[in-house]
């Protein structure tokens, strides 16, 4: 069967992450100047590494982190493609030295290497990144070649004591040796007016009456903000390097941001007040009369008394509630629980939709490129394509991976290319010439997770039970048809057929017992399907679906006249003369008798006894996460069934594992959770101490792993609850600001859910919540806490409050 994938590939500039010490004024200046020479250069973050100034540290004790961890937060938030160090060792100091792997040398470079002499040709060029020189040429040819003067003039700024303001706000060219050609090309293309930095020039730029040097870096870019604010006015001291870094980065997650230097405040306060008043208007179609508001953000170096004085100046001309006041913050992505969170802007230039066939375990596709760029440039990588692929419904293909920003040696999926870089944005491929094609290997979920565990020092191989469950998942179209078995009675009859249960032969005086031969009368199945049709709201089952999936096979039942064994013959095995399966004697088919009966026989993994060695519970648990938590199909999930795990610390078996990510609409994706679990059937004491110890040792080796314990029965026994509570409380312990191991508990209530887990809870009644918050079903940690409250009657937040009181 051909497997098809759909998705997109989006063109954008390479995202550089410039690592620099907050006190290194000279390097910050160079970074800002080189950003004026890069396509999308002002979309690149400046990541402070090293000792932070005191005013950058949070006044809230619970938000305080070591400077190194804050720098790592910057990296996780911005997810740079290329890391540029202002001095050697900065990446290593924050744990990103793996990016310096020799096979990845171009993804970690020094600031001096950015403009390299390695490349020979008709002129110098950037070692990495798309140069603005191509933009100048294309822009000139498209707009200026036959026009003596542009309506909106370009500017070029004088070099003076206000150079830091020019670099941060307007753009300036590098002072580096052999880099003066950028300025010359700019002058030739735009004939700019020489200007001095000042309030008047600021007004002309932000009122759209002049274009500064950074303007061409945005050619053909669409920048989509993820925050919904009308305006942000960033007030800072340009003599403080930390303030310049704060302003530079704030632009990348707030919009629009107007920089207001304290030295120009008196001249610009009229513009600010007018803009705040203009923004303060009713939100359309809002019945509550809510108004748009602006925000005034102060850099953290600005003293409190200065900030109060500035607010008084604005307040005198602005109505109450027209703006609110804040302080600049270190950015943290939305997966971080602690403190304010934000989302960086989406940047792209072009996008192509993909519809692909997986052939030989791989896909290929054309990728967009910037039309203004020369076909072959000097740099090794000039732009990026971000690929997002999805299957139609649940799939056994590995399309969801954890980010590899720190160590890019896994996964290696780009055939003949380096990468991809896996981020919350997608799979990032770095390109350097026109009309190139992308080639990606598509692994199975089992292969992907086993390779990832090997990188973590854990050998993983499919277990015997895991192979059975894998076959079941495959038969059910990678969980898309899991609803067929999401019924207690259906599983019970399938298991009874698989067990070959002995039944009494009431017609025999000797009371002999015979094997049923893994069969059941068709009438019994028709009754079951009729019953399910009355009780279900979503999935209409039919016997045709069971036979087409290879679960059941139709045939005829016939007793042997020699040994009375109950035989079953498939439609291709019926003849005038048939052979008994037991005694191997032939006998004539009874053509005139009523004895032959139509029967179904269970086949494949469904014919394995003992509830298919737990495969039903595993399959339905995976289906619950893939479908029933979020029925609209916005889940990213890469899964595997049972594995045998072995490392120096332990040797254990787990029933399933998967990466799970709730996709976000119009947003970067979240970081996927790694989930492992144990799945049991209907036994009264199904969960044993050893099962939970297996999960615990995995979580010790991989902190943050989500643990799942599921059973097909509706309730855990009291003994099981005591064991589970110990595991839950162990998992509550904080490691690096997060729970060590959130524990999710599922029963038949969730696994047999007719529509969604939420609906099933509502129908079941107490202790299940009737109105659980929607966030419970989109965040695995919150979902874990809710299942703990339901099944164990313990509440994580109540426990925290008790600890604080004591």
Where are these regions (language model features)?
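Intrinsically disordered, low-complexity Ser/Thr/Pro/Gly-rich regulatory segments
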Residues: 1-243, 248-806
């Amino acid at each position: 069967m051909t497997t098809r994938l759909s998705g997109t590939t989006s063109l954008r500039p390479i995202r550089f992450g410039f690592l620099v010490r907050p006190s290194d004024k000279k390097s910050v200046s160079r970074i800002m100047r080189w950003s004026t020479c890069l396509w999308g250069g002002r979309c690149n973050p400046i990541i402070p590494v090293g000792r932070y100034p005191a005013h950058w540290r949070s006044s809230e004790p619970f938000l305080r982190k070591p400077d190194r961890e804050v720098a790592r937060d910057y990296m996780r938030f911005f997810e740079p493609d290329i890391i540029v160090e202002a001095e050697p060792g900065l990446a290593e100091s924050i744990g990103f030295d793996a990016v310096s792997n020799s096979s990845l040398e171009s993804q970690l470079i020094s600031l001096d290497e950015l403009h390299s002499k390695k490349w020979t040709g008709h002129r110098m060029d950037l070692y990495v990144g798309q140069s603005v020189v191509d933009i100048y040429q294309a822009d000139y040819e498209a707009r200026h070649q036959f026009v003596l003067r542009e309506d909106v003039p370009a500017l070029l700024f004088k070099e003076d004591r206000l150079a830091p303001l020019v670099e941060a706000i307007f753009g300036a060219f590098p002072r580096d040796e052999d880099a003066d050609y950028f300025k010359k090309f700019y002058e030739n293309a735009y004939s700019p007016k020489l200007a001095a930095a000042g309030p008047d020039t600021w007004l002309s730029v932000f009122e759209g009456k002049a274009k500064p040097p950074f303007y061409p870096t945005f050619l053909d870019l669409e920048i989509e903000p993820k925050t919904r604010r009308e305006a942000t006015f960033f007030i800072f001291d340009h003599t403080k390097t930390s303030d310049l870094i704060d302003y530079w980065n704030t632009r990348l997650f707030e919009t629009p941001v107007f920089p207001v230097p304290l030295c120009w405040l008196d001249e610009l306060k009229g513009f600010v007040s007018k803009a705040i008043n203009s923004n303060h208007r009713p939100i359309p179609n809002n019945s509550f009369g809510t108004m748009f508001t602006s925000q005034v953000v102060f850099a953290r170096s600005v003293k409190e008394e200065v900030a109060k004085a500035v607010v008084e100046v604005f307040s005198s001309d602005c109505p109450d509630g027209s703006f609110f006041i804040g302080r600049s913050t270190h950015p943290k992505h939305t997966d971080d629980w602690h403190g304010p969170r934000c989302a960086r802007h989406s940047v792209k230039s072009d996008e192509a939709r993909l519809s692909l066939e997986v052939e030989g375990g791989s896909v290929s596709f054309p990728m967009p490129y910037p039309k203004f760029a020369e076909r072959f440039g000097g740099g090794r990588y000039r732009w990026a394509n971000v690929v997002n692929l999805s299957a139609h419904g649940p799939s056994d293909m590995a399309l969801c991976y954890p980010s590899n920003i720190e160590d890019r040696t896994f996964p290696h999926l780009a055939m003949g290319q380096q990468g991809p870089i896996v981020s919350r944005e997608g799979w990032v491929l770095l390109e350097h010439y026109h009309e190139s094609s992308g080639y990606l290997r598509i692994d199975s979920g089992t292969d992907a997770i086993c390779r990832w565990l090997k990188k973590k020092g854990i050998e993983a191989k499919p277990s015997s039970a895991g192979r059975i469950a894998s076959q079941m998942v495959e038969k059910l179209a990678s969980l898309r048809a899991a609803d067929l078995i999401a019924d207690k009675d259906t599983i019970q009859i399938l298991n009874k057929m698989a067990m070959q249960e002995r039944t009494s032969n009431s017609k025999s005086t000797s009371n002999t017992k015979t094997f049923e031969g893994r069969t059941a009368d068709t009438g019994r199945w028709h009754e079951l399907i009729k019953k399910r049709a009355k009780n279900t709201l979503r999935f209409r089952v039919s016997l045709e679906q069971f036979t087409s999936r290879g679960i059941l096979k139709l045939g005829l039942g016939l007793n042997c006249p020699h040994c009375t064994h109950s035989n079953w013959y498939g439609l291709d095995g019926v003849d005038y003369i048939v052979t008994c399966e037991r005694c191997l004697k032939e006998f004539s088919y009874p053509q005139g008798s009523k004895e032959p009966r139509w029967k179904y026989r269970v086949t494949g993994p469904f014919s394995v006894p003992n509830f298919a060695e737990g495969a039903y519970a595993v399959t339905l648990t995976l289906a619950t996460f893939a479908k029933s938590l979020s029925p609209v199909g916005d889940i990213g999930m890469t899964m595997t069934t049972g594995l045998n795990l072995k490392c120096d610390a332990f040797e254990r078996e787990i029933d399933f594992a998967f990466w799970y990510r709730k996709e976000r609409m119009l947003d970067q994706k979240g970081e996927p959770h790694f989930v492992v679990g144990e799945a049991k059937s209907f036994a009264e004491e199904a969960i044993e101490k050893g099962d939970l110890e297996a999960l615990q040792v995995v979580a010790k080796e991989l902190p943050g792993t989500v643990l799942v314990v599921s059973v097909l029965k509706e309730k855990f026994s009291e003994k099981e609850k005591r064991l589970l509570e110990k595991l839950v409380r162990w998992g509550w312990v904080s490691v690096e600001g997060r729970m060590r191991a959130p524990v999710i508990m599922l029963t038949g209530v969730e696994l047999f859910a007719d529509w969604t887990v939420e609906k099933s809870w509502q129908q079941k009644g107490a202790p299940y919540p009737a109105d659980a918050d929607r966030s419970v079903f989109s965040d695995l940690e919150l979902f874990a806490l809710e299942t703990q409250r339901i099944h164990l009657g313990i509440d994580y937040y109540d426990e925290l409050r008790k600890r604080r009181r004591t």
